[in-house]
Amino acid sequence: MKATIIIPNINGKGWLKDSIESVYAQTEQDFELIVVDNGSTDESLEQARSYCSRPNFTLIENGCNTGFSHAVNQGIARAKSEFVVLFNNDAFAEPQWLAELLRAAESDE
């Protein structure tokens, strides 16, 4: 596995699904996706749960808001790859985003 993508989430109902879909639309598919939910009270936790059957998808459910840094650190602790990428729950990635990011990370320049 080349990369772990971590999405911390709290009440991202309006964006989370599209954000996750943009990750799964990447041309580079050698990644795992970890969503860390920080006690969402909207429907975004249910949106995240709908991906649990996908390979290389992990959902960490915090019952309350443990804070952004703690959520990110939880994701990092579960990462199985050399490279870890933080991705906001309201961000949308172009299809080449991960491939280009990994190319830059792996280059000698």
Language model: regions and residue ranges:
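A conserved acidic beta->alpha catalytic loop
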Residues: 22, 37-46, 64
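Cell-envelope/extracellular polymer assembly enzymes that use nucleotide-activated donors
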Residues: 2-4, 32
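Glycine-rich, basic loop-to-helix element that forms the pyrophosphate-binding segment
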Residues: 61-79, 89
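Short beta-strand/loop segment that forms part of the nucleotide-sugar
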Residues: 31-39, 58-62
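Short, acidic, metal-binding catalytic loop of nucleotide-sugar glycosyltransferases
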Residues: 22-30
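Acidic helix N-cap motif at the loop->helix transition within catalytic regions
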Residues: 17, 42-51
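Conserved donor NDP-sugar-binding/catalytic core segment of glycosyltransferases
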Residues: 95-109
